[in-house]
């Protein structure tokens, strides 16, 4: 009994020691397991980050906070309008207008997209769109969602908010070089803040139209200055003829380009065609500007099946002033930095015939405007490309070319290719007043021969160009034009020009081109009539392409004017 007494405590201590060792091993195993789990988690997160950085993957912005937007007002009203057939797919809008010519601003999307990643790097197919935000003018909008179908329940879900995504149906591919139809013009969207600043807000430097009161029985072929064949005084509707002076040039210029973005192959669309020349629903001035009627007869538009490339290069008739409209479209992915411009001819049948479309090239060292016969395809390599306007670094000198090839790049051009032809040069000069004074322009054109045909100028290098010839004093065979200097009016405190009722809004872009020896004989005049609508009237020896290119140069920003 005495020997067994001490064994009891020793056995209890050994059991406690074994239990302590067991707990220690379990703690070590659990620690190793946690370390392995942590390493696996880090590897998984690293793999997910690499997958998200791959191209064509929708990436989330961790700094952005998702906000729940309240539904806009008037959704029920928009749905009721759509039920009455007033939507984009209405047959009333598509009866005489091809779907390809619906404006890109007719649809605007505010879509919240979500996708599901499952570690495999693949995504499920996209659900059929349950809708988007369709707006008409300033009307209401309806918000819908798009999402990716999940592949598994263990996936990571991320949301991305994408704004200003145009919802545009793919237009049919048609070649418009052979057959052209007359598409009616419609002005662009409402006025923006930049355009409000561009229009004159003060009386320091603006140009007012000092159109005299028309005679009781004016001769439609004689203008207010007594010149035959010039612009005749236009008759405006009673609700717009409140006074005889109309603003024509003002402070400010086009908003400057803030940066060049990578050029994409997006499709441009002409404004919606309509049978009546009308303005924006929310701007009464647009409506008034489009309802002005002029007693002077207009020239007929292009015939169906006529070669449009030859038509836009043909000089205007000698005894007629060709009246046109330019519509600017500033909606799209570029957010107004690279708008599109559409030229329409106001024909004698009361219909505006589409002639040309132009846009500024994005990936270019200097300002470069491409001009095409197709409003849907304004690319350099398109079959309907007819010309371009290129500027120097300062944006003060613009050269107009046709669709020929550059002779300095003959190493990759076939021998059968036609060398490009220079159609003119536009030079802008700075003035002492800067923005507070009118622009000074000089237009240099190739001369006309005895058959009233334009002389060909096809320089092989820069030393043979029109601008170099003028700088060297060899101006033989060239025609020099300049803008008509406005006069200062003490009564209105502004520079004034007589635009004969064709210009109704103040803008620094408004100008008149005349011959130096005949200041009362207008060759080209350009001015604003609505926020995104401008008139362009020209005559011999200009052709539609030359006149349109000169006006495009007026839209471009001038670095030398800063």
UniProtKB/Swiss-Prot annotation:
GO terms for cellular component: cytoplasm; extracellular region. Its main location: cytoplasm. Residues 1-81, 179-294 are annotated as: Disordered. Keywords: Cytoplasm, Phosphoprotein, Secreted. Gene3D superfamilies: Tubby Protein, Chain A. SUPFAM superfamilies: Tubby C-terminal domain-like (SSF54518). The modification Phosphoserine is found at residues 152-153, 155, 213. GO terms for molecular function: phosphoric diester hydrolase activity; protein-containing complex binding. Disulfide bonds: none annotated. The modification Phosphothreonine is found at residue 211. The keyword Cytoplasm applies. Residues 285-294 have a biased composition (Polar residues). It is found in: Cytoplasm; Secreted. The keyword Secreted applies. Expressed in retina and testis. Residues 35-46, 225-240 have a biased composition (Basic and acidic residues). Belongs to the TUB family. This is Tubby-related protein 2. It comes from Mus musculus (Mouse).
